[in-house]
Amino acid sequence: MGGILKNPLALSPEQLAQQDPETLEEFRRQVYENTQKNAKLTSHKRNIPGLDNTKEEGEIIGTSSTFLPKDTLSLKHEQDMLAKMTPEERVQWNQRNLAENEITKKQFQDIHIDEPKTPYQGAVDPHGEYYRVDDDEDEDNSDKKPCQVANDDIDDLSLGEPEFEIKENKQPDFETNDENDEDSPEARHKKFEEMRKKHYDVRAIFNKKSREALKDEDEDEDDSTTKEP
């Protein structure tokens, strides 16, 4: 027989007369079963409260990839159901997760982690207790600041007499260039011009490079002749 979209009333009177009552009854039963299956698939996908989400033996409920669009009546029914529910009823708790958490709490309720307290040191005050002298009975140091007391202790420290006498070198470590001091600005300028001319003398540089290259070639030839048997 036809599917759910088949409308037996659209048949002609002659066709209806040819169909027996058992065939019409079977068609209506199939339509009803298909409607129930579609309702269960939709309720399983949307998880609508108030609908029967039970799964019968041998019946396949929609998977996660199943999606059936809702009609206007289903949406209106769902909105009416949600409007009647209280905020507490709308909340859907994960009972399985709650039960697992309770079991975990019971298993680890006697376990305690003992950790030492983290040492805390506040801001250091230069005039605080960490900078005071241990000997509070010393009246001479009572009026001095802690840094002054520490400097006095260092000054009083003596390393003793040296084993060897070190002669002081009265001569300066470097020699002053008196010539540069005595030169006049004209002489310094003339010297600068000569040095610059020597630096930018291309011919002299080329001749120097040529002599160095010839010298290197001569050394290579001498090395090769000495290595021959």
Curated annotation (Swiss-Prot):
The modification Phosphothreonine is found at residue 118. GO terms for cellular component: cytoplasm; nucleus. Keywords: Carbohydrate metabolism, Glycogen metabolism, Phosphoprotein. It comes from the Eukaryota. Residues 175-184 have a biased composition (Acidic residues). One of its GO terms (molecular function) is protein phosphatase inhibitor activity. Residues 1-21, 35-62, 107-229 are annotated as: Disordered. This is Protein GLC8. The keyword Nucleus does not apply. The modification Phosphoserine is found at residues 12, 158, 184. Modulator of GLC7 type-1 protein phosphatase. Pfam families: IPP-2. It comes from Saccharomyces cerevisiae (strain ATCC 204508 / S288c) (Baker's yeast). Phosphorylated by the cyclin-CDKs PCL6-PHO85 and PCL7-PHO85. Phosphorylation of Thr-118 inactivates GLC8. Residues 107-117, 164-173, 185-196 have a biased composition (Basic and acidic residues). GO terms for biological process: chromosome segregation; glycogen biosynthetic process; intracellular signal transduction; regulation of signal transduction. The keyword Nucleus does not apply. Present with 3440 molecules/cell in log phase SD medium.
